[in-house]
């Protein structure tokens, strides 16, 4: 079901899906709700979903089953009388994920606060604070190095900070730079992400992403320096 008000301030999408398999006869539905309200200064979203343990999507990929998830969002936009900044905004997004089959145990929580600005030359910049809680349901090595994994059943609460700047996208050459640092499970992380784009209209368009992560975990867990180069 799709919702749209006449003034376009309210819109939303709602669904209920059921999968039919011979093997499973229950816990095979998925339900999703998404309601949005938008004005010049204020926007908010109320959204969530339920995916049963036995739900099988034949039409697409489902990241996780057996969860209840809510992820509302609130954003307030400012319109300053400024020659450089067109708009800037404050945004808050909490995310909660529960496991119904485990007495609705909280498995993950994200709290995200963001400030962002759009400049008159089409460049953007901002800062983000992220806090995450997670419960591990299996042994997990966050460095992906096959080192000593964090043990199943352990819980972690960690916070990191991020800033970003994107140059004007209207230019032939543009870039986005995103440094970040903070806690990472039971250790620390420093990261930098650089995306470069170049185009010759209308014949050529290319980009490359370069990411570097420096992960430090306490003994006996592994450290890692991870470099990713991904041309597109």
What do these predicted regions represent?
Residues 2-6:
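Hydrophobic, small-residue-rich alpha-helical packing segments that form membrane-like cores
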Residues 7-232:
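Exposed, low-structure sequence patches enriched in small/polar residues
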């Amino acid at each position: 079901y799709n919702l749209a008000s006449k003034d376009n301030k309210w819109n939303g999408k709602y669904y209920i899906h059921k999968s039919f398999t011979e093997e499973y006869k229950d816990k095979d539905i998925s339900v999703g709700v998404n309601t949005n309200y938008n004005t010049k200064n204020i926007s908010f979203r109320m959204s969530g979903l339920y995916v049963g343990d036995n739900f099988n999507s034949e039409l697409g990929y489902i990241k996780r089953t057996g969860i209840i998830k809510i992820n509302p969002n609130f954003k307030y936009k400012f319109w300053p009388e400024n020659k450089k900044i067109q708009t800037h905004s404050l945004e808050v997004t909490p995310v909660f994920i529960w496991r119904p089959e485990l007495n609705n145990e909280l498995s993950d929580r994200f709290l995200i606060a963001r400030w962002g600005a759009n400049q008159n030359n089409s460049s953007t910049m901002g800062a983000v604070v992220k806090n995450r809680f997670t419960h591990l349901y299996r042994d997990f090595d966050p460095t992906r190095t096959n080192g000593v994994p964090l043990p199943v059943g352990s819980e972690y609460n960690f916070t990191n900070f991020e800033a970003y700047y994107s140059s004007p996208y209207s230019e032939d050459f543009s870039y986005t730079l995103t440094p970040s640092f903070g806690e990472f499970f039971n250790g620390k992380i420093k990261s930098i992400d650089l995306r470069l784009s170049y185009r010759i209209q209308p014949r050529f368009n290319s980009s490359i992403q370069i990411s570097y992560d420096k992960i430090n975990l306490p003994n006996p867990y592994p450290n890692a320096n991870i470099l990713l180069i991904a041309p597109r």
